[in-house]
């Protein structure tokens, strides 16, 4: 497909990794995801995490109520795994289609992960059930150990946790989310398995860790996993350009109020929902790989999750689009990814 293309029409994509938060933030940010994406995997790490069916049903209702009328958006709900998760609740939630998967957060590895797993061996009985019922496991793949350099935590997690896990449960469907390193890419490619995939964010494709320190510290580029060396950014860009079916779109859009991003203990997360699809198409164009854009955005994810591919389409046009400087929510603001900057692509109205 020509890199000089002025318009591209694709099957409407899904976002396989979204943080919508709750309350006033939810009411504002859900519109962006609901506009660009047909379905989205909703992360369960609220302050009161989505650990059971009741909370999931209630949260899903709040999401749908936050949408503008006639928005044909489908939130896909995930169970937050703890060491107290009930096997019966997990299985019932999956069979009743309340949950489409379960999320493993290593303890205190990211936002609202204090209820996460301290010892993965303590939930092997849950993985045994999930493997049998074909319930996907979504993983924040970082080893949370102060003795491990924070830039090495993904690679160490793969070596110390993921490899033994997959050896024990070879037919457990696993999504290694928001991958950031050559090591993650190599492992997924070497396995080349229908039971293992990775999602990739727009910010890890567009930026590397140098960008966090240009003209001073850039708190709005602080995310977990962190931006990595340029060689890892290049590896991510190369793998999506290869057309590999083992990787798909997961924006990890993660809103926080501006005041919580710039304070002494700033929150990790990049709110990219207003621009994520435009960022992805820009990278595919730069890599002269637009022929693989639809597969990455709209086909690889549903195929991995054994879900139907969407019937609707969306059209992107080569027309400059300026990202909002800020988004007002009551007396607070959220600063989106690439705030105030122009992208070469827009969504056709």
Curated annotation (Swiss-Prot):
GO terms for biological process: 'de novo' pyrimidine nucleobase biosynthetic process; 'de novo' UMP biosynthetic process. Its EC number is 3.5.2.3. Coiled coil: none annotated. It catalyses: (S)-dihydroorotate + H2O = N-carbamoyl-L-aspartate + H(+). Keywords: Hydrolase, Metal-binding, Pyrimidine biosynthesis, Zinc. The modification N6-carboxylysine is found at residue 103. Its cofactor is Zn(2+). Zn(2+) 2 binds at residues 103, 140, 178. The active site is at 252. Substrate binds at residues 19-21, 45, 140, 224, 256, 268. It holds the Pfam family Amidohydro_1. The keyword Membrane does not apply. Pathway: Pyrimidine metabolism; UMP biosynthesis via de novo pathway; (S)-dihydroorotate from bicarbonate: step 3/3. Zn(2+) 1 binds at residues 17, 19, 103, 252. GO terms for molecular function: dihydroorotase activity; zinc ion binding. One of its GO terms (cellular component) is cytosol. Binds 2 Zn(2+) ions per subunit. It is an enzyme of class 3 (hydrolase). InterPro entries: Amidohydro-rel, DHOdimr, Dihydroorotase_CS, Metal_Hydrolase. Catalyzes the reversible cyclization of carbamoyl aspartate to dihydroorotate. Belongs to the metallo-dependent hydrolases superfamily. DHOase family. Class II DHOase subfamily. Homodimer. This is Dihydroorotase.
């Amino acid at each position: 497909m020509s890199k000089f293309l002025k318009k591209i029409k694709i099957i409407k994509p899904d976002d396989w990794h979204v943080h919508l938060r709750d309350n006033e933030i939810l009411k504002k940010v859900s519109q962006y995801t609901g506009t660009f994406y047909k379905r989205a995997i909703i992360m369960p790490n609220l302050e009161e995490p989505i650990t059971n069916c009741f909370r999931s049903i209630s949260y899903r209702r709040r999401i749908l109520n936050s949408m503008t009328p006639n928005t044909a958006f489908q939130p896909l709900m995930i169970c937050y795994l703890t060491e107290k998760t009930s096997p019966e609740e997990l299985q019932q939630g999956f069979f009743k289609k309340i949950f489409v998967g379960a999320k493993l957060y290593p303890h205190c590895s990211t936002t609202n992960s204090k209820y996460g797993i301290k010892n993965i061996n303590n939930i092997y009985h849950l993985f045994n059930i999930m493997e049998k019922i074909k319930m996907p496991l979504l993983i924040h793949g970082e080893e949370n150990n102060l003795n491990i350099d924070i830039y090495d935590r993904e690679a160490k997690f793969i070596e110390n946790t993921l490899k033994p896990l997959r050896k024990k449960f070879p037919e457990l469907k696993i999504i290694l989310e928001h991958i950031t390193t050559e090591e993650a890419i190599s492992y997924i490619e070497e396995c080349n398995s229908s039971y293992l995939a990775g999602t990739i964010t727009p910010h890890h494709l567009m930026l590397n860790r140098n960008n966090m320190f240009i003209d001073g510290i850039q708190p709005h580029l602080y995310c977990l996993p962190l931006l990595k060396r340029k060689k890892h950014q290049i590896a991510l860009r190369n793998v999506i350009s290869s057309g590999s079916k083992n990787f798909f779109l997961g924006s990890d859009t993660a809103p926080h109020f501006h005041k919580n991003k710039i304070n002494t203990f700033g929150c990790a997360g990049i709110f990219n929902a207003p621009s994520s699809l435009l960022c992805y198409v820009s990278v595919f164009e730069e890599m002269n790989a637009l022929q693989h854009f639809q597969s990455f955005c709209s086909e690889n994810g549903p195929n991995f999750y054994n879900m139907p591919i969407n019937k609707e389409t969306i059209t992107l046009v080569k027309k400059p689009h300026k990202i909002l400087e800020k988004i007002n929510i009551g007396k607070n603001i959220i600063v989106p990814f690439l705030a105030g900057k122009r992208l070469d692509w827009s969504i056709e109205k």
